[in-house]
Amino acid sequence: MANLNLFLTILKTAAKQNNHPIPPHLAALTESRTLTETDDLNAALQQAGESFDAAQCGCLFANLSNLNIKDGRLQNRDLKRESVKALRIDVRDANDVVEAVKTLIQTPEYFQRPEDWDLFCAGPLAMAHADQEFTSEEKAYLERYVPDLKHIEAGAKIVKEKTPSELGETLAELSSRQRRCLAAHSISIMFIDGSWKGSEQEFLELAIERMRIVQFDSDRLLKGLYTLFNVSVFS
């Protein structure tokens, strides 16, 4: 419980400093809690580094990164540097996490035309339905990113009309940056509800193959986004 409180205190403080909301995937941890802040974020990071295990340190770093990027750029480079040091994060792992998070945040740069947003929604929706279930967490995640909910309806229609293979071929026509971004969101949808099934993994592998995402990129995205959403290490 002490580690969870420290985790949330650090994130609440960083969110306020960088003018970010607390992201929805932390809702289950923050329910019925009054989130506090710290006057000394660096000291709190040092305490976390001494108290947390490796998985908890990684999760904290990933979620700090999620609150430290705006318009595709780091807002506070000192925060990244201090958190890498205090939490004992390997520099290469840190860069993988930051790149994965940046890929999600840069979505509005890559998807601008209405028809592209329709396809954007189709990918994560197909992933969400791969286990025959569309959870409230998955729905809230998708709604957070789209500029208009009508694109979700259009994406659902695309999913209904196409087989997974046909959908993959359609998504393959997007630009390389769009495909990589879409792969990141599909991975996030797989992790967002705290559990994933073999059917989701199979769909993801098919989608990555059809969208021609290289193994190096998909591995980096998987590692970074799993670390971001693996908040169960604090439960």
Range-by-range predicted roles:
Residues M1-S235:
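Small-residue-enriched hydrophobic alpha-helices in membranes
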